Design a protein with these regions (language model features):
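Positively charged n-region of N-terminal signal peptides that target proteins for export
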Residues: 1-5
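Hydrophobic h-region of N-terminal signal peptides that target proteins for export
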Residues: 6-18
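Signal peptide processing junction and immediate N-terminal pro/mature segment
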Residues: 16-26
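Active-site beta->alpha N-cap acidic-glycine motif
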Residues: 24-145, 230-231, 248, 264
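C-terminal domain-boundary segment and adjacent tail
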Residues: 65-68, 81, 170, 221-224, ...
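Catalytic domains of cell-wall/extracellular-matrix polysaccharide-remodeling enzymes
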Residues: 79-85, 106-255, 261
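Glycine-rich, charge-decorated loop segments at or immediately adjacent to ligand/cofactor-binding or catalytic sites
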Residues: 88, 179-180, 268-272
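Short alpha-helix boundary/capping motifs
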Residues: 92-93, 120, 188-190, 273-278, ...
Length: 315
């Protein structure tokens, strides 16, 4: 009897001793896996070929729900000041996603015609609408990721963000999903029965290619695996292909995390000094370092970079 109790005691001690090792191994694995959160820009009220607004919007939300991923919608509410727009905002809010600021009318801050005072008004006007939502998130994303073409505008608006309690809703993984979506809609408008598998494959290939590129830069710049935020738009491509895209990231070993968790990463405290300012945060940090001139292009991402390949593929 005493021997049995002793053996049981040893077994318990052995199992207890193994638990920290297992947790440590899990922690080490997590620290070496790339992580990504999904963020969406704009907000559309359009019906799309084959899908009503309610249908394709719900497809995005359903796929986020399927993968247990909480996103941020950076909304510019100027075009959303109607019943359909209110539906979009409330549907995302009720699904537990954050609603953040993307200006009211989506102006380009790097345009000399867009003054600092005009841009401040854009933030405030948008803020007055989105602040009423329970999941309001005090982050601001620059339209087109353009943060100003002069030092005065860049520093002036950064000071304004801080004054108003906002943080910069940086993208770390930039891409041109909007361009693929525009061609997808064009094809389905021409032929609602068109085979879109080629668009799906190209979308996944493009988004993942940009993720690998920016993750590699981030590794070199920080010496670790950061929490990424990837740029998508509220569009038909996301509705049709998001499930496959997330599955692809998972298959490649990426961990999907919530957007508000991603924004807690210390990398988002970095303030690049390059002017013109903007693009992906990782692009800006690489540009600032002066070590990656052969790897960087300007603009960092653009539909023009995809046109020839999509043309050749008949997309």
């Amino acid at each position: 009897m005493a021997k049995s109790i002793y053996l049981l005691f040893l077994l318990i001690i052995q199992n207890l001793g193994g638990m920290p090792d297992n947790k440590l191994a899990e922690k080490e694995l997590s620290s070496t896996r790339p992580k990504v959160a999904f963020t969406f820009d704009d907000g559309s009220t359009r019906d799309m070929p084959n899908y009503s607004l309610e249908e394709w919007n719900e497809m995005i939300l359903s796929n986020l729900r399927k993968h247990d991923a909480k996103a941020v919608l950076f909304a510019n509410v100027g075009p959303l000041q109607n019943e359909k727009g209110k539906y979009v905002l409330s549907s995302w809010d009720k699904a537990g996603h954050k609603i953040a600021n993307h200006t009211y009318t989506h102006p380009r801050f790097s345009d000399p015609k867009t003054t600092l005072e005009m841009f401040k008004t854009e933030l405030l006007r948008n803020d007055s609408v989105i602040r009423s939502y329970p999941n309001f998130y005090q982050y601001f994303r620059f339209p087109y990721l353009k943060e100003g073409e002069t030092k005065e505008k860049v520093e002036g608006f950064r000071a304004f963000l801080k004054e108003k309690g906002y943080k910069n809703g940086h993208v770390t993984i930039d891409a041109s999903d909007w361009y693929i979506a525009s061609r997808l809609v064009e094809r389905l408008t021409e032929n609602p029965q068109a085979d879109v598998s080629g668009f799906r494959d190209f979308y996944i290939e493009h988004m993942y290619d940009r993720a690998v590129f920016y993750d590699g830069l981030a590794d070199e710049l920080t010496g670790r695996k950061i929490h990424h935020t990837i740029l998508l738009h509220h569009n038909l491509a996301a509705a049709m292909f998001l499930d496959d895209l997330i599955a692809h990231f998972k298959e490649k070993g990426w961990e999907i995390i919530d957007a508000d968790e991603a924004f807690k990463d210390p990398v988002f405290n970095e303030v690049p000094t390059v002017v013109p300012a903007g693009e992906s945060l990782i692009w800006a940090l690489a540009k600032q370092s002066g070590k990656y001139e052969k790897d960087l292009r300007y603009p960092a991402e653009n539909g023009d970079y995809l046109k020839a390949k999509m043309d050749s593929l008949g997309l």
